[in-house]
Design a protein with these regions (language model features):
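Carbohydrate-active catalytic/glycan-binding domains of CAZyme proteins
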Residues: 1-293
């Protein structure tokens, strides 16, 4: 018998995993095991329930990191419903899945504080529209070895019109995944990284936060200075690029964000230098520097 796992579920009961007989397509019902959150009909509970707005689960195994990544959509599926993408991980397919803060979601909790928020509502100076309600995601590794995130994107002032989008995913040094700020356009991560001189300059920073709301996360201007400091009107901190690698660490206040630096083209055709990084507080930040011709 060939067996596969299926992840499914939504708001009311939560997210479950059940084995599927690949030959018949029928579920293989397990024995109930209350201590390990196994229901004889629904299968193994991974997280959620209690009418928390969690749906659209997808699990991707990444052989490079050795983790199973659980992608989820939070919020209501409308442009102003706070729809967004979150991420958990585990080294086994059936859990326990934890977020970047090391927290799981078996019990009733305020779900906005759980799960690494990969992206929500945002805009950048070069974008002609404000991007709203990303979600309904799946992820995969392509034949070229790159990881991709596929999802649907809504916009401000266009009702419920939506479009499919594909962004490249990158592994952080500590084994999490972060998405490129812009739709993929053939960009490739430079494995030996960039020098400090190449990176430093004026960036537009978007912090996706952890809220579930119609708030649009707007860019703030910051400066990545040659002396390793970060300065801005409302933010200050430090930054450091790890020599010979694509990794970057940005500290803003008490929060440390780890991620990658890459060069890519935005949706308007501008060449940019970007960073995408996550923190143990479940926030993701994007920084974009527009490169002059």
């Amino acid at each position: 018998m060939c067996i596969r796992d299926r992840v499914y579920g939504s708001w009311s009961g939560g997210i479950f995993l059940i084995e599927i007989d690949e030959e018949t397509g029928y579920p293989i019902y397990p024995e109930a095991d209350e201590e390990n959150h196994v229901d004889s009909y629904y299968g193994k509970k991974l997280l959620g329930g209690y009418h928390n707005s969690i749906e659209g689960p997808h699990i991707m195994y990444d052989e490079t990191s050795g983790y199973y990544y659980l992608f989820l959509s939070y919020g209501n599926l409308q442009a102003k419903g706070g729809y967004q993408m979150r991420l958990f991980r585990c080294d086994t397919v059936d859990g326990i899945y934890t977020d970047a803060a090391g927290k799981d979601m078996y019990l009733f909790v305020e779900h906005k504080d759980h799960g690494l928020k990969m992206m929500g509502n945002y805009t950048f100076p070069s974008l002609t529209q404000t991007y709203m309600a990303p979600g309904g995601q799946t992820a995969f590794e392509d034949e070229d070895g790159k990881l991709y995130l596929v999802y649907h994107q809504r916009f401000a002032k266009t009702g419920e019109l939506h479009e499919p989008r594909v962004h490249q995913l990158f592994r952080t040094k500590d084994g999490w995944l972060v998405a490129a700020p812009f739709a993929t356009d053939g960009e490739t991560l430079k494995e030996d990284g960039y020098s400090g001189d190449e990176i430093q300059g004026t960036f537009y920073l978007v912090n996706h936060g952890t809220d579930i709301s119609d708030k649009v996360h707007k860019p703030q201007g910051i400066q990545l200075n040659a002396d390793g400091t970060v300065t801005g009107e409302e933010l200050e901190g430090t930054w450091e690029a790890e020599e010979g690698t694509p990794y970057i660490e940005v500290t803003l206040g008490e929060n440390i964000y780890t991620g990658v630096v890459l060069a890519m083209t935005d949706e308007a055709g501008n060449d940019t230098m970007c960073f995408s990084a996550k923190s143990d507080n479940n926030e993701t930040i994007w920084g974009v520097k527009y490169l002059l011709p």
